[in-house]
């Protein structure tokens, strides 16, 4: 089992986190409150593939990244 561990050290308000395996279509998501000691742990399958990770802050800022699990 794999997990996405996120640590946020600024108060961004509520943050939406989504992870999608672009090869299988599997998706996971959660919402968490950010702050000085805020953390989120999102379990994912860890199946091989290219993944997209997206964070959307309460103010509407969007941060997107990609990673590969072989």
Describe these PLM feature segments.
Residues 52-70:
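C-terminal tail/sorting-segment detector
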Residues 12, 25, 58-60:
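Glycine-centered tight beta-turn/hairpin loop motif at sheet-sheet or coil-to-beta transitions
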Residues 21-27, 51:
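Short, glycine-anchored, charge-dense loop/turn motifs used at functional sites
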Residues 34-57:
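Short, surface-exposed loop/turn motifs with a glycine/proline- and acidic-biased composition
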Residues 9-15, 23, 47-48:
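Short proline/glycine-enriched turn/loop motifs at strand-loop junctions of beta-rich domains
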Residues 16-18, 53:
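Generic short beta-strand
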Residues 26-35:
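Solvent-exposed serine/threonine-rich low-complexity stretches and specific carbohydrate-binding patches
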Residues 1-6:
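Structural beta-strand segments of beta-rich domains
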